[in-house]
Amino acid sequence: LYTCALCTKIGRYGIISNNVLQKGKGRSTVSEFSVSLAKLAEEANLTTAYTPCELDKIQVTATEVYRPGILLAGYYENFDNKRIQIIGLTEMSYLDELSTSLRNTHLEKLFSFQPPAVVLTRGMRPMSEMMQYAKQYGVPLLMSTEMTSALMGQLITTLNTELAPRITRHGVLVEVYGEGILILGDSGVGKSETAIELVKRGHRLIADDAVELRRVSYRKILGTAPANI
């Protein structure tokens, strides 16, 4: 039995943290995996102000989101256009104070980078210029009623889970007293039988035979059954 320290508990998943997953320790902000913008919008309860196509056709690969305050001030260096852009009350207030010409310049620059989406928080409606440049450059423009920090936290959590580096191991994953336990061993040594005995005692079976492990952060590994099994 390999007992893994509990980090947290998310729904039907068992959460484990150990050195079982070696890949992904130095992962960059861009993942080899992707998640559809439609799934992110559903998870975060986002509404659509404009989209050039169905949201499920747009894939997001960056594990972070970005508030483009410094870009709207005219600094464009090192801008990562793979991140979802979040515009909160601070950015909107700043844009309101700019002259029409300067506001158009900075907004056009933002949308010309063609990020996966631009999201307005706190129930704010997009400016007419935002709609204009969203249509011109084909950038989805979404809205949320959440506070900016709350929405960013939710999106980052979802992105870290969906885009996490992952491997599949032969074994059985159970949850015992809230802790994820990964049972490893050769075929026929009794992994499934051990899991059955634990289930009889009121514990939960998470995955049998094949276990998908995702490193959702540097200290957490998420274990679940592979989606295609």
Feature annotation, model-predicted:
Residues 110-116, 135-138:
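Short, surface-exposed connector motifs at secondary-structure boundaries
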Residues 179-200, 204-205:
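Glycine-rich phosphate-binding P-loop
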Residues 26-111:
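Gly/Thr-rich phosphate-binding loop signature of adenosyl cofactor/nucleotide-binding cores
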Residues 158-178:
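P-loop NTPase nucleotide-binding/switch module
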Residues 83-86, 116-119, 139-142, 180-182, ...:
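Structural motif
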Residues 125-158:
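Charged, amphipathic alpha-helical linker segments immediately N-terminal to NTP-binding catalytic cores
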Residues 207, 214-229:
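Conserved nucleotide-sensing/catalytic segment adjacent to the nucleotide-binding pocket
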Residues 2-19:
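Short, positively charged and aromatic/hydrophobic N-terminal segments
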